[in-house]
Each structure stands twice: as C-alpha cells, then as structure tokens.
Amino acid sequence: MPHVDRRTLLWAIAAGVVAAISRAPSSGAVPIRWKIPEGRIPPPAGVLARLPGDGNQLALTVDDGASVPVVGAFAQFCRDTGTRLTFFVNGANPSWSVNAAALRPLVDSGQVQMANHTWSHPYLNRMKLTAVDDQIRRNADFLRNTYGTDGAPFFRPPYGVHNADIDRVAADQGYTTVTLWSGSVGDSAPENEAALVANAAKAFQPQQIVLTHANLPTITHCYGQLTNLIASRNLQTVTLNDVFG
C-alpha cells in the first residue's frame, strides 16, 4: 500500500492499543543471558541478507518503530530476557525519542544496536538522489544525537527496495552494508499471534537475519513463545555489531 496509507494505518492501530499492552510485555518469557560472541569479522561491502558461517547465531532485526508502546515493550523485553537485537530506526517516529531513556542504557551496553532505516520510510527509488541523501543523513544525525551512534555501516532501505545509485549515496555516508533479511515474523500487517509464532518457527534458524517490526501490538503478546522457541533450538541472539566489527 502507499507509504502514507501504511503510516496512517499503523498510527491508528497503535493509538488504540496503548492500554492493552501496558501490562508486563515479557510475561511468560524465559530469562536467558546470552554470551557475547567472540571473534568478529569485517562487515561486507554490499548486500547482507544472512549471517556468515555455520554457527547457532540468530540476528533479530526490528524495523520502523511506529508505536510508542510497542517500542517500549521491546525495551522491556530486552531488559527482562537479555535478548540481543538490532533496531532499524525511522527517526521521524516519536517512539525513539519517547523511549530513549529506556533504550540508551541497552545501546550503551551493546545489548541493543541502532541502525539506519531512513528518516521517514519512503520508497527511495521514487525520490531524487538528493532527497535520498537527506533521508539517510537526517536519520544519522538523529541517531547520533539521541543514542550516540549513527549505526554505520548498516543501512536497511525501506521495503528492501534499493539500486546501485541508492547504495552509492548510502555508502558515501558510511553505510556500506545494505542489510536485508533471510526470514520474517510476518508482522508488517495485522496478524494473529498464532500466525506470528508459526512464521517465527520457520524463520528462527541458525545464521538467519530475521525481520520484525515495532509497529503493531500483536508481537508483544508473543514474547514468551518466541523466547522459548529460541531457547529450544539453542540459538544465540546477536546484534550485527556482535558479528561484524
């Protein structure tokens, strides 16, 4: 659907569920303290869609942040379970400013990573390159000012849409690794909990980069099931910085 319609839908849904997810979001989750991986490798120049090697790592990546309470629930989930993950942030969403006090300690500790997903989530291939540059640069400035990092070299183009010109503009700002994904929880549109858990069961495999979103509340009701799934498969959650350095 068009970007403006998508954002309007997400905000409307998020506004109606603030009270519903004010309860402890990680109820039922198994608390696991992940060991930080040893021995990082250089990040690839170009497209990254899967972690290298044959280990047991799982890179959870969380996009957008259209909902203030859902971003807050993710922060609480990370604190409660020790899960390591990477946020791909749209700085235009107020959730990243509202929840900065909760997230900044997790970022400073390295448990949570921030990366660049553009300022406002447009289709970059429909814009002039000067506008693409502004989208990336404005978001980088926001990340530095709010979280002390610009997330380079990891950049995720909205909708996964990019081309050589977009990649060059991103690389000129230090974002040399276009980060896509190899599996998805399937929560970009409204789904029930059973569907999200079923999608996760397919996606949560060794060395996968998994896409999820901090937009709709249903994902916050699945935290316990998702954490149990990770533990049952002996997977180790990692940020991208845990793997590449």
Identify the function of each model-found stretch.
Residues 33-116, 120-123, 131, 135, ...:
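Active-site beta->alpha N-cap acidic-glycine motif
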Residues 194-195, 209, 213-214, 220-222, ...:
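Extended hydrophobic blocks
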Residues 62-64, 89-91, 116-118, 157-159, ...:
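A cross-domain feature marking catalytic cores of carbohydrate-active enzymes
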Residues 1-60, 67-74, 80, 100-104, ...:
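N-terminal pre-catalytic segment of deacetylase/amide-hydrolase enzymes
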Residues 161-203, 235-245:
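His/Asp/Glu-enriched short active-site or ligand-binding loop at hydrolase and phosphoryl-transfer sites
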Residues 79-86, 113, 129-163, 197-212, ...:
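CE4/NodB-like, metal-dependent polysaccharide N-deacetylase domain
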Residues 65-69, 90-99, 122-127, 156-162, ...:
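Acidic-and-aromatic substrate-binding clefts and catalytic sites of carbohydrate-active enzymes
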Residues 73, 77-81, 102-109, 142-146, ...:
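Alpha-helical structural signal in soluble globular domains
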